[in-house]
């Protein structure tokens, strides 16, 4: 029996470190010899750069980027375009056969807007694993951007951590969050080896975990509860 697939969520900061990105793809190539791998990625820094270049500004609320519908063409271009194809190119350089996707492809995830004040910011839930099963069955590496759409066809910006969680739930996969930090830090700046629900609530309440890390740990907790297995956060 084949082991469960592994979903690796890659932060946008990795795209600014070509050496680290190449090393990661080399390791993914090795990992594919033993199990299926699926990559889900963000691209926050790239979005910021493209928006700044076009004179656009945005704010974040609880780690989520407020996204007017008018900004979606730029965000789609950054995530589903530049970031996705850059990762696919790096995968090819490592001898991997990638397939660039978004959350709407194959109806893999169902997405809906979270709240009107956040604009085109959505949340994803598992829907159909058919496309991903076909791809990993043929040894392709799905590289999935965090762009989704609602049932009525509205493009949505999905937080990449939450998107990766939904993909892991869909595939019954293990989940690994990679970012530019070593892991979750305590109030003394020391990395926590483990983190349970009670510890997380305490660190959030005391303001140790905030913003983007709160979104990441919330997604990891949800995934751990749904998958009934640990979720890993690291660099």
PLM features: what roles do these ranges have?
Residues 1-232:
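Nucleotide/pyrophosphate-binding catalytic subdomain
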